[in-house]
Amino acid sequence: NTGFAEQNYIIPDASSCSEVLYTLLDEAKISREAAECLYTGIVHDTGVFKYNSTTRKTMEIAGALMEKGVNAAKIIDDSFYRKTYAQNQILGKALLGSTRILDGRCIFSVVSQKEMEFYGVDTNDLDGIIDQLRITEGVECAIFFYEKAFNEYKVSLRSNDYVDVSKVAA
């Protein structure tokens, strides 16, 4: 953040905007509803606490929010793991249709508009497919394409430890 506003409150190593907001609030006055919103923001921005941006402070704040009555398991399940039957079908199609290349270090999959129509899903239902591809054992780089319009594709790139996909995406 370049500090472009008149007033700036920047915590460079904060995991999320929600973590920054928490530090600005009077902890005693945070309601359960507000705590749920802050917790949801932290969970999303940290990838359920697995991204490098997650710190001890992040975990302490999450714990304090849980003490306000946040149902952490429900928020995480509803946000990341609960899928409709159609979402599971398109995920299965994407995984079954995936191809490993470069001695198995890279995996890619493509979902067409025709397949999306067949399963009755839209682009929001494709969330999580790239992450499932990425966590395949032996894979360093995952690529997921889905067709937005005839011959127009959205491409998602994810990597694990050794490949900087931001250099390709830039």
Locations of regions flagged by a protein language model:
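Short alpha-helices
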Residues: 2-61
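Hydrophobic helix-and-loop "lid/oligomerization" segment in the mid-to-C-terminal part
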Residues: 47-170
